[in-house]
Amino acid sequence: MAAVATLNAQTQTVQATLAGGADNEHLCVSVGQPFFQQKTLGDYEFSMGVAQAQWTRDTVYDVITYNTPYTENGFDLPAQTTTHKDSAYLVNGGIYNYDLLRTLYLIVCPEKVTDAFSSGIEYDVLAVTGHCWTKQNLRSPMSDAMSYTCAMYPTVPENYGLLYTWNTAINGTVADNDGYVKGICPNDKWHLPNAEEVDALISNPIVALRSENDWFGPEINTNATDFTAFPAGCYNASSSRFEGLYTQTDWWTMIDPGSGGGSTHKTSLELPCHCYTTLLVTRDPNDAISVRCVMKNEWPE
């Protein structure tokens, strides 16, 4: 079986061109670094180890990197410098025909990304349902960024981030040629979440998105996705008060609120407590809520 691949570290994109000869569960690809092991069936053979994958239509593969020597495959692999983390492998295509030459495009989430306004702030990155997200809420030091001001319940910026009005979150940016809006996100590869990305995220159970700790309510949160949504609350502009700490969290989105929301209102994604469903909320743009960012899925031409 013929197989070639290239790794572009700058774009974090792996392109593997695969030829026939594989069966329905196994296909070998040599791509060098890093080493991945997939958590489902089948095998990819990498120069530094074996990564397993199951071939299905438009599949997203969640993989794990290792930071300790891994020798179960007999390759006696060296220790990796990265920590254990999930990444996304996105297959751009339909059902694979193994007797035909096909191209497999893979996107790997970076481990961290640096804040756009402070080089001293970094955010972890994780893959959730086919997209790379910042694992923490942004805490960019904007002049009008807010922190929850309840003396009884001080928040932890590293966990809860800061709260931003719509105009601050957008930061004067407009949609690029691909329709993405960067806002205060780390760099031009990152943007505020759109409808497709939000839909993919909330296809997960709400308990799998919420942090295991800090939430009021009877639900048992699993944080199975590692998204770690802390209940950061919000600032309500109409009442000029902070509310919702430990009971809800919201993020600005680029979802059109529709005619019912009014021309100035914007849409947030809300995770409430005492509830097993996520909400899309039409908000006053002067409200201040959290911001998370998503990385573009850029496929080669």
Stretches found by the model and what they are:
Residues 1-4:
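Bacterial N-terminal signal peptides
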Residues 7-11, 42, 47-109:
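Proline- and Ser/Thr-rich low-complexity, intrinsically disordered segments
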Residues 6, 22-23, 71, 224, ...:
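A generic alpha-helix preference that emphasizes hydrophobic side chains
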Residues 10-54:
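Residue-level hotspots within well-ordered secondary structure
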Residues 110-301:
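Conserved positions within compact, well-structured domain cores
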